[in-house]
Structures are given as structure tokens and as C-alpha cells.
Amino acid sequence: MRNLLLIAACISLALSSSIAHAAGGGGGGGGGGGGGGGDNERVVKDADYKAAMVAVKASDWNQVITRMNAYVERNPGDADAWNELGHAYRKTGDLDTAFKDYGKALKIDPKHRDAHEYLGEAYLQAGDLGRAEAELRTLDSLCFLPCEQYSELKAQVRRYKSEHPPLATR
């Protein structure tokens, strides 16, 4: 019974954190509860950040890039911002810049689950299944229970494998 209560409390905490993050509720541990959050939790999200996140919802990737670049000039220690910037560059097909920005996010917050998920998706986009699977293993170690980021990347890896079967060996 005690274990059930502990699990229920953890799930409740995870859900409330996810809801706060989805509503734009600050650092939340660095992008979906990525870890300790570090200095990121003290960053005040300004008009550029908020406009960029509206643009994310509208899939206006060029606007995300413009507004988030302006934001990170003033707030270079915000892992969430670097992650979203990488996301936008990935969506426009600029994988080189996306990889650099995901790297910046993970340097700030090595446990940033959203950055690990998006980095794995970028590796799949680049055709690098091995590195995508490495990000999946990292997410597996970061998530207490299977988290959203792990589940989404796992589904993307599964889809990639079904669309790119291994070549037959001789």
C-alpha cells in the first residue's frame, strides 16, 4: 500500500509539472522536468520568448528563430530557449545549427529531457539511428517511469526502423 501511495504521488507530481510546462510555466526543472534546472529556473521569460512559443504552436519556424535568437542574446543560460531554437532549426532542415543548439541546451542542463528527445529526432532526420538510440537510452536513464519524451522518441525510432529496414547481409 505504501508503494502504491508513493507511485501515485510521483505520478501526480509529474503530471502537475507537465501541465505547468505545457502552460508556459517557467523552467520546471529544465524543459519538461529535465533535472535540477540550474540557473534556468531563475530566468524570466520575456516577450521574445513568449512570442517564440506562440510561433512554435503555429509552426512558424522562421519567427521562432528570429524571436528566440533575440531572447538568447540576452539570456544565453536558458536551456529551454536553446532547445526550442534547435527544434526550429531542425524543422527548417538546418540540422547543423540544430545540433549546435541542442548541444548548448545540454551543456547548460545535461538532463534536459526535451533536448535529448529532439536531438534523437534530429539524428533520425540525419539518418543516424545509432545516435538516436543512444539518446533513447539516455532518456530511459533520466525518466523514473517512461516519460513522454522517452515514449515519443521510442515511437520515432520504431517508425524509422520500419521505414528503413536493414540491408540483407550476404
Region annotations inferred by a language model:
Residues 84, 118, 152-156:
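Canonical tetratricopeptide repeat
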Residues 46, 80, 97, 114, ...:
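Start-of-helix register in tetratricopeptide repeats
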Residues 26-45, 136-170:
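Terminal, low-structured helical/coil segments at or just beyond the last alpha-helical repeat
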Residues 43-77:
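Alpha-helical segment of the N-proximal tetratricopeptide repeat
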Residues 74, 108, 141-145:
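Structural marker of alpha-solenoid helical repeat scaffolds
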